[in-house]
């Protein structure tokens, strides 16, 4: 059975890593133990929308997981207030200690008590991982010390207890306790979440997406499912001028000039001066917005005309401005539109566009962040039996997968998302095809785009006074994803047939205030729009949802709005979470039930074959 050429060659390669039967046995024992540990905790977030402070807090409290562990350990021994103090210390160790020091609350007894409490929390969180994995997570400067403290055991003569106390006493005496507390707090947060899923839209109206990406850049394990706002910035960084105009317009609309000018070095001065001169608007931001909006519709029109396969001809507006006066469009707001060539930039606009283009494609920090989005991101992800995507899988009015004509072929369902992923990556190479770069704009705003899924009415909202024309029809997906059979159809399309498979979806806010439920299709689909956008909190009634998937099952968490870091430090204010157990596994889920576990089982099988081979020698 194992003597064919393929297996013989494979076994020879395995032997290079395991030089004896004892090496093989040791690895089989190791992997067999690993696959029987509890599954690590997955944390799902979506629609961060550039809101850094709220995002930082939800990352620090791990969607309430830290508080749950602190309560589990200390509920019977320390007060509610002291538990909240400990949680805030874990969330913001440096800032909280500075405040406590000002209040005169820190002394050697406080250090000793706090260090012991933090070690207990770290011990609990590390218990589901191998010692090797925990060691890899330890901060290098304290790795040996923390490893000793986490694994100190009581013995008959209390030797280990004395050893433990002496380590902590020495740290305090050497005045290194602050840094040690910071290191322990970081370890606790790292152990609380094994893997992070960002289900789209790091960017949008919030002004600090750059800070969020800086934080994510160093995160230990994550994936990103691109959102429509992410792909817009990615398209801008690829050099798509329509995407560049959209990015600038969106940030001017929400007065987020800092992310453009300070974070990414995009100068708006020339655009502002042109807008003030051409549109007669004194306010620089409003003038720049007026100018970039007209440039946007010109450039979008060029793309629509060049790509009839986008099926977006109904979005061509500048060649019928006179007709649109009947619905309130003021022709005077388009001073640079030439009736003979309505979609052509004039000379001044073209000069401005070239300079903006150059800044977007050469800006080092923006390119670093976009490269990260490409490296960690994709159109969708199948992970541990769940299907993750931001927007939708486009369907027609009958619920059948809708077709889109790309590069000479029709694509639908999973093949469509795969093709979109391929095109997006092709746009971010040296000397890309113009068609691939053009497609980035379609992904942002195309009615049949899996990332958009609706007809954007940007023109109407900007210029039309009749608000009845502002409604943006959505893809039938959004009316059908309440149906279990429809969601199962999508899951099957992506190769998921297990009863425990789910769709994890972002993109659309859940209006809890109106009784809307984030759980759809009898539990087959979860909408986890994170609700970080402050402007939406009053409309939805909450600050969105996150999802936790640990060894005990799935838990959906609803959040209250975040106030501020200052409030959290002074008053121990947390983002309150209400947790609903959506699915409680009948048995605890182990590593062997995960994607990684299945690969390890395959490795164990191969090692058994190698062991048989050794024993036949």
Question: PLM features: residue spans?
Answer:
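Feature recognizes metal-dependent phosphohydrolase scaffolds
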Residues: 1-617
